[in-house]
Amino acid sequence: ERVFRGIKMETKQQFLEEINKVKGSKRDYLNKLFQYVLEAVIRAAVHKNVKKDEFIIRAGEPCDTVYIILKGDVAGVDYQKLGKVYYFMDFAKMYIVGDFEIFSEDTNYNVSICASKDSELLAIPASIYWKWIKHDENALLLRIKNIMTILTSEKASDRKYMFMSCKSVL
């Protein structure tokens, strides 16, 4: 697993203070999600600053870390054959990245994600996150609801473009 430079979380209070810096519904969601978080998750979490255009996750690399997005924005990116970067999705509604693969039991990340502006994250080792969330009914239900909302929205968007004429897409 990766080793991160950053501020290591020592107490639940410190962990929740980081989450409470977040604004609005995102803060409410994260507070509910981590209401019964285990000490092991807190002690393993590291606060990390990420610069704009820095990769957080790279497709094909081992799925070893889950990231809580505290501040900033992230986007899914793909490299085309000519070396151009294609931004395919803004993850503004995603508060956590890196756990879809855990739920689907993939060993490697399926997408590359980079910061679309300077961002702050909490990095949690995937194995510790998984041990916690699969035994915390509250967190598991909240996370599954969020994942299903995202997937449903993506599929609706895919269908919209699938039935457009080439002229309309351009």
Model-derived features with residue positions:
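Short, surface-exposed helix-loop/turn micro-motifs enriched in polar/charged residues
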Residues: 86-88, 121, 162
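Cyclic nucleotide-binding regulatory module and flanking cytosolic helices
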Residues: 4-52, 101-103
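A short hydrophobic beta-strand segment most commonly corresponding to one strand
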Residues: 119-128
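Hydrophobic residues at beta-strand termini and immediately following loops
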Residues: 48-50, 91, 124
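Cyclic nucleotide-binding regulatory domains
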Residues: 54-117
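Phosphate-/nucleic-acid-contacting segments
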Residues: 1-7, 164, 169-170
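A small-molecule sensor/coupling module
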Residues: 108-110, 127-169
